[in-house]
């Protein structure tokens, strides 16, 4: 067995309770307020090329100052920049524009793939990775969040030969199938495997 695979299985065994609790939190997210769900979307809009903790801190700061729903682009960009979120001006614009969909985020199709396509079509700043991340964080199942950590992990275990330089829709969907099958082979859900691989790279179960 590949050393990396052994490590993943060990992490899953050691952190299984924590992982299951986190997945339950995701499942319960759509029962929360519209602002809570919108905050999760904004977190995912902020994550490209930015540490998850930095993005999370920025969202928390905006909510504390009542800016997430009401702040202008400049106010939001300033907080993003202060917290180390890359491309703050662009992402601030995405957050302001996404407010138009605040009330519709709880009414997406129940099918994860249909929900993802709708998000990508309608919300500027969301690609396959970001839309998958949001949907996983509000309880959807069966999607892969193919960020650089996950892709490097896939290379380590031999699922892919190289980390692609760019992810077209076709490439994303092809690699997603491989990731989902790999999770199944390990006896995990794709959602659990994602958290395991993140814990392997960062030492913590986050989101």
Regions found by a protein language model. Name each.
Residues 59-124:
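Alpha-helical ds-nucleic-acid-binding substructure associated with the helix-hairpin-helix region
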Residues 55, 67, 71, 104-107, ...:
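Secondary-structure boundary/capping residues
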């Amino acid at each position: 067995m590949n050393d990396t695979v052994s490590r993943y299985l060990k992490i899953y065994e050691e952190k299984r309770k924590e992982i299951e609790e986190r997945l339950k939190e995701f499942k319960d997210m759509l029962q929360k307020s519209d602002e809570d769900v919108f905050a999760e979307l904004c977190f995912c809009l902020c994550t490209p090329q930015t540490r998850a903790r930095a993005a999370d801190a920025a969202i928390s700061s905006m909510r504390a100052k009542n800016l997430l729903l009401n702040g202008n682009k400049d106010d939001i960009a300033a907080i993003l920049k202060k917290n180390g979120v890359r491309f703050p001006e662009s992402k601030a614009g995405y957050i302001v524009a996404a407010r138009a969909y605040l009330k519709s985020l709880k009414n997406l199709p129940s099918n994860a793939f249909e929900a993802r396509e709708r998000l990508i079509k309608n919300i500027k700043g969301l690609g396959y990775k970001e839309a998958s991340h949001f949907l996983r964080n509000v309880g959807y199942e069966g999607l892969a969040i193919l960020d650089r950590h996950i892709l490097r992990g896939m290379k380590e275990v031999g699922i892919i030969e190289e980390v692609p330089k760019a992810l077209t829709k076709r490439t994303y969907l092809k690699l997603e199938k491989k990731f989902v099958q790999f999770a199944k082979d390990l006896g995990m859900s794709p959602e659990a495997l994602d958290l395991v691989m993140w814990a392997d790279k960062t030492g913590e179960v986050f989101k």
